[in-house]
Amino acid sequence: MEEFVRQCFNPMIVELAEKAMKEYGEDLKIETNKFAAICTHLEVCFMYSDFHFINEQGESIIVELDDPNALLKHRFEIIEGRDRTMAWTVVNSICNTTGAEKPKFLPDLYDYKENRFIEIGVTRREVHIYYLEKANKIKSEKTHIHIFSFTGEEMATKADYTLDEESRARIKTRLFTIRQEMASRGLWDSFVSPKEAKKQLKKDLKSQGQCAGSPTKVSRRTSPALRILEPMWMDSNPTATLRASFLKCPKK
């Protein structure tokens, strides 16, 4: 799984995921599924923000090519991917500037057009189940929730999907590709099943020549900074210049 992640995600995304896991004492060599899920969530957040700007008239526009003469502001502020201290500094600054209500939990993005924080979720389960879990945790109507699945489904607060259909389709296609690439390498089942994950971990440790006494238990602890995890796997926390370039997964 670790090799797959390093091949299939932008190096900047991988680096951010490594820093997040290191900050909370998590070993990516052991918790490889979490490593993959953090990278997936980061990429979705960056794709959500990509190409969306606000022009001089305050209108939301999509620009895929940089125009040095255009006075444009990024529509979305990316909060996900920052260390906790910096992330809260950004959130506080946004609240002071816009008058937005400070969220209880760190969100993933801020939408300057709709003036709201956004929580992004990526799940392999039924989207409505994960949405309800997320809403129950956040307990705030001020934070907009948008959930994507690896099967192409999505769910958002009040059916307001924020982005245009084409932008959302890019995200869904990327998630489907990740799923297919994992499956082709025999990694998908272990990514979504705790039992299969343990088997895969034991197999990986054995292939790495580690001793029989090496730890094989997969941690179920959820890092505070990586709250958008489902109960076992990561679903989901920099600047405007850190936009992901999306690499196709090379075949074996």
From Swiss-Prot:
The keyword Protease does not apply. It is found in: Host cytoplasm; Host nucleus. One of its GO terms (molecular function) is RNA binding. The record marks 28, 65, 202-203, 206 as: Important for efficient shutoff activity. The active site is at residues 80, 108. One of its GO terms (biological process) is viral translational frameshifting. The record marks 195, 198-199 as: Important for efficient shutoff activity and nuclear localization. The keyword Translocase does not apply. Transmembrane segments: none annotated. InterPro entries: PA/PA-X, PA/PA-X_sf. Belongs to the influenza viruses PA-X family. The probable endonuclease active site in the N-terminus and the basic amino acid cluster in the C-terminus are important for the shutoff activity. The C-terminus acts as a nuclear localization signal. The C-terminus is recruited to host protein complexes involved in nuclear Pol II RNA processing. This is Protein PA-X. The lineage of its organism: Viruses, Riboviria, Orthornavirae, Negarnaviricota, Polyploviricotina.
